Amino acid sequence: MVNEYKRIVLLTGLMGINDHDFRMVKSLLSKELKLNKMQDEYDRVKIADLMEDKFPKDAGVVQLIKLYKQIPGLGDIANKLKNEKAKAKRKGKGKRKTAAKRQRQEEPSTSQPMSTTNEDAEPESGRSTPDTQVAQLSLPTASRRNQAIQISPTIASSSGQTSSRSSETLQSIIQSPETPTRSSSRILDPPVSLGTAYSSAQALGVLLATPAKRQRLKNVPKEPSEENGYQQGSKKVMVLKVTEPFAYDMKGEKMFHATVATETEFFRVKVFDIVLKEKFIPNKVLTISNYVGCNGFINIYSASSVSEVNDGEPMNIPLSLRKSANRTPKINYLCSKRRGIFVNGVFTVCKKEERGYYICYEIGDDTGMMEVEVYGRLTNIACNPGDKLRLML
């Protein structure tokens, strides 16, 4: 149950907000989570792990709902979290009821009469009790079902995906409690026909053979996919991450970066029409077309190149793919790549040197060191050795 709540916190609560709101939420939860300086830079996945440890009852869903109701623009997500929590709670109650019912079915009845070797003998009272009637009906039904159900494991094994839990569930459905061998001279209902039992077994076998598939990515891409030149075709993607608009030239023209993904790969995007910022919301599904691939980026210049998808078909982006797309690259990896590649991550400043009209920062991690030259208005940013520097290049 806690894992279900954690899924809601991570996928709906933390992945559903932008970076600015995430930093705000992290700041407001810092005392409850007891974040230190190193943990201040934790991403959404690590914060979800901390919340699961701090709030073992519901992984922090209630805390997020309270916070989101107070933050402008996050009211809808608060309501969504509330609904998801209610669904998870109902689902958990349903599972407990099913387990209790199954346990009652598997327990032998203490009120059943003792069996006798004379099957034609009449009951002493001259009539059957309700328990006796149930036992009389279950014996032929169960025996026929057990004969017919033998083909179900063969059907299920052809798929190679049958879980032991599904087998136990199937067993509890088709097996009756222990019944006495004593029979009565009166049977209220006709026994279940062999054809009916066979059809039921066959239907259960088909259900068992086709369990729900969990999407798993065999080869998780470590680098963004690239496309070159003008691309007229459309691509259905989910927005994973978006930056705030920033000026990219001396005229003050603005753009923003985004990371989007299909179910098997992810892409870096440059958007030069900031009107589209309203559409680029984390976890939103979009269709992009008529874009230009250049230097590892998808460049979008016009609002007409992006449209919202409302077909009702969800996109399931594997968590491993999300992690790969949001991971800060290592220094040795960046040094091995060509100039002009996309960089988005948080790095530690080891050294700072002012060189006239620009500043040279030396950043590093456990794999090496790299120099970063900063020009123009960015030289006014207060950043010193030991500080963390977020780079979006």
From Swiss-Prot:
InterPro entries: DAPIN, DEATH-like_dom_sf, HIN-200, HIN200/IF120x, NA-bd_OB-fold. Residues 152-169 have a biased composition (Low complexity). GO terms for cellular component: nucleus. It is found in: Nucleus. Signal peptide: none annotated. Residues 1-87 form the Pyrin domain. Residues 82-188 are annotated as: Disordered. Residues 219-393 form the HIN-200 domain. Residues 108-118, 126-151, 170-186 have a biased composition (Polar residues). One of its GO terms (biological process) is activation of innate immune response. Belongs to the HIN-200 family. This is Pyrin and HIN domain-containing protein 1-like. It comes from Mus musculus.
